[in-house]
UniProtKB/Swiss-Prot annotation:
Single GO molecular function: protein folding chaperone
Organism: Leptospira borgpetersenii serovar Hardjo-bovis (strain JB197)
One Pfam family, short name: Cpn10
Function in brief: Together with the chaperonin GroEL, plays an essential role in assisting protein folding. The GroEL-GroES system forms a nano-cage that allows encapsulation of the non-native substrate proteins and provides a physical environment optimized to promote and accelerate protein folding. GroES binds to the apical surface of the GroEL ring, thereby capping the opening of the GroEL channel.
GO cellular component terms listed in the entry, alphabetical order: cytoplasm
HAMAP family given in the database record: CH10 (MF_00580)
Family per similarity comment: Belongs to the GroES chaperonin family.
Assembly mode: Heptamer of 7 subunits arranged in a ring. Interacts with the chaperonin GroEL.
Name the record gives this protein: Co-chaperonin GroES
This protein's record includes keyword Flavoprotein: no
Lineage: Bacteria, Pseudomonadati, Spirochaetota, Spirochaetia, Leptospirales
Amino acid sequence: MASIKPLGDRVLVEPRQEAEEKIGSIFVPDTAKEKPQEGKVVEIGSGKYEDGKLVPLEVKVGDTVLYGKYSGTEIKSEGKEYLIIRESDILAVVKK
């Protein structure tokens, strides 16, 4: 797991990994693929302040979430790719 602790209302998400794709005998490179918009919450911030009170985040570590296509900041840590996004950029929690 990454040793990154998001601040405030931010969430650290590990995007779902796509399998390598081939169309016929042609390999489709990562740069030509759509980025996944689903991932697993790895770490969460402490929450956000509203009217002087700390409001905890609704998502929890381990939740699978859907987020906007252009949401967040991509980072790499310990050889893995992560996104740091605001909780407000999370569109839904996937119930399995």
